[in-house]
From Swiss-Prot:
Coiled-coil ranges (or none): none
GO MF: arginine-tRNA ligase activity; ATP binding
Motif 'HIGH' region: where in chain: 121-131
Annotated gene: argS
Name of the protein: Arginine--tRNA ligase
Single Gene Ontology BP annotation: arginyl-tRNA aminoacylation
InterPro entries in the record: Arg-tRNA-ligase, Arg-tRNA-synth_N, Arg-tRNA-synth_N_sf, ArgRS_core, DALR_anticod-bd, Rossmann-like_a/b/a_fold, tRNAsynth_Ia_anticodon-bd
Length: 563
């Protein structure tokens, strides 16, 4: 039982009419540790108990008797709890040393599936930093849900269909060189895509020609299909090379094209439920009763289906295939109206499981404050960026530890980890400005800072030749080790909070906090002094390293043992 639940259960013994969940929500962490580890404000009980909060606080403090507390005292309207540092540190250290990397593993999900729609880059366009957020947020959420007992299903819903393929075919037929495309597929296709979009801005006929080629593609025209398949195959080769470098895997690559033959069923279902309404020649579903002003456009007047029709087919397919407990869409903020419509249409179709679908939006990545755009050629490509991050990490490692073995492997872990961590430490709905120098820094709130704290602890443990043992009686009661113990004890709750909020930044901030606490401890404590507490201090080091490594793993970041 964590300390908050312990305190809540003790308070409930004194005030049985109060729900434990209410008590938990009221508990506060005092700004000053001299006021205790946790405090309970008695204001909310004044009305029911018809007493002053100060008297209620005093009554509660007097009645609580537990050997888990050093003392419980009332200060004004607050009940302040001082936890028994020695007893709790002993429990926490034994638990982590016993569980190892499985510490904080929970079975909330009971093996149920969580479908995660993530990454989803567009075929024939380079994998840019703009795609990074969906990829690393989705990957981290998969790790987090796995940790609490769910079975994540990672779906790369590739952007492999749409009018842009009409544009690309027009561009290739105008200016394309097969040899050049085969040699450098993505680079060459990007040049063609940017060039055709620039021409379309001054020549309206380009758009019409692109629409015509896309219509041919929809009708399975052999030439259009062959070009489309080629663009797709070449792009996937490049994407998979990058995913390997980022250590990201998927369970499904079913993209937009996969649902081409599954949309007729959606239209039939909507018709059978009398949900389709004609509007200016198009077919729509009205959603006003859900507070959505604009109807969902299902089929255009020219018979073309739309993005939402495809997503309806995908939602039905995923429910039937995975029977998900949750279905998460890790897609940018700008798509929020689309996902509100998607859920509302499914609700209209009487699919109550639409309540289990969640859009997990995120903010934009900018460069120098400017929005990135593939179409305009203003883009930061991931591959050269990762290479530069690894080089920067390598030069810092060379300066810090020139004799390090496996320098290249460590530089890879630090460089790739730096990019991932910087993205994930940002509150998901906020954007951030891309700054590689800040990302790869060993100072400040960065991935390398946390990795370095972990490597430093491993160095201490090697020097001491520490072997964890559950038979030892580990116990600490100094202030600085107590700050670390409280964080480690809180780790299971932190993971659940990150899952509940679909927010990996909660884990990243926890890891930064734990690394900072340990570095402070390291600066003020002679860890290797041969005295009665040396084994307890080393156990604390071991537990901290275990939790730091697991925090980083949940973010998809490696933790080298040496840096």
């Amino acid at each position: 039982m964590d300390t908050k639940h312990l305190i809540a259960s003790e308070i409930q013994k004194v005030v049985p009419d109060m729900e434990q969940s209410t008590i938990l929500s009221l508990l506060e962490t005092p700004k000053n540790s001299s006021m205790g580890d946790l405090a309970f404000p008695a204001f909310s009980l004044a009305k029911t108990l018809r007493k002053a909060p100060q008297i209620i606080a005093s009554d509660i403090a007097e009645q609580i008797k537990s050997d888990q507390f050093e003392k419980v005292e009332a200060v004004g309207p607050y009940v302040n709890f001082f936890l028994d540092k020695a007893a709790i540190s002993s429990q926490v250290l034994k638990q982590v040393l016993s569980d190892g990397s499985a510490y904080a593993t929970q079975n909330i999900g009971e093996g149920r599936n969580v479908a995660i729609d993530m990454s989803s880059p567009n075929i024939a366009k380079p994998f840019s930093i703009g795609h990074l957020r969906s990829t690393v947020i989705g990957d981290s959420l998969a790790n987090i849900f796995d940790k609490i007992g769910y079975h994540p299903v990672k779906i790369n819903h590739l952007g492999d269909w749409g009018k842009q393929f009409g544009m690309l075919i027009v561009a290739y037929k105008k200016w394309g060189n097969e040899e050049a495309v085969r040699a450098h597929p993505i680079d060459e296709l990007l040049k063609l895509y940017v060039r055709i979009n620039a021409e379309a801005e001054t020549d309206p006929s380009v758009d019409e020609e692109a629409r015509e080629w896309f219509r041919k593609l929809e009708a399975n025209d052999p030439e259009a299909t062959e070009l489309w398949q080629w663009f797709r195959d070449e792009s996937l080769l490049e994407f998979n090379r990058l995913y390997d470098q980022m250590n990201v895997t998927f369970d499904s690559y079913n993209g937009e094209a996969f649902y081409n033959d599954k949309m007729d069923e959606v239209l039939e279902l909507l018709e059978s439920k009398n949900l389709l309404v004609e509007s200016k020649g198009a077919q729509v579903v009205n959603l006003e009763k859900y507070g959505i002003e604009h109807p969902a456009l299902i089929k255009k007047s020219d018979g073309a289906t739309l993005y939402i029709t495809r997503d309806l087919a995908a939602a039905l397919y995923r429910k039937r295939t995975y029977d998900f407990a949750k279905s998460i869409y890790v897609v940018g903020n700008e798509q929020s109206a689309h996902f509100k419509q998607l859920k509302a249409v499914l609700k209209e179709m009487d699919y109550d499981w639409s309540d289990d679908m969640t859009h997990v939006p995120f903010g934009l990545v900018t460069k120098g404050g400017a929005k990135l755009s593939t179409r305009k050629g203003n883009v930061i490509l991931l591959e050269p960026t990762v290479a530069e991050a690894i080089n920067r990490a390598a030069s810092q490692i060379e300066a810090k530890n020139p004799n390090l073995a496996d320098k290249d492997k460590v530089a890879q872990a630090v460089g790739v980890g730096a990019i991932k961590f910087y993205d994930l430490k940002t509150d998901r709905t906020n954007g951030y400005d891309f700054d590689l120098e800040a990302m790869v820094s060993f100072e400040g709130e960065t991935g390398p800072y946390v990795q370095y704290a972990h490597a430093r602890i491993q160095s201490i443990l090697r020097k001491a030749n520490f072997n964890p043992s559950n038979s030892d009686n580990y116990s600490l009661n100094d202030v600085e080790s107590w700050e670390i113990i409280k964080l480690i004890q809180d780790f299971p709750r932190i993971i659940v909070r990150a899952a509940d909020n679909f927010e990996p930044s909660i884990i990243a901030k926890f890891a930064i906090n734990l690394a900072q606490c340990f570095n402070k401890y390291y600066a003020h404590t002679r860890i290797l002094d041969e005295d009665a507490e040396i084994s307890s201090r080393l156990a604390l080091c071991y537990a901290t390293a275990t939790v730091l490594k697991e925090s980083l793993r949940l973010l998809g970041v490696d933790a080298p043992n040496e840096m």
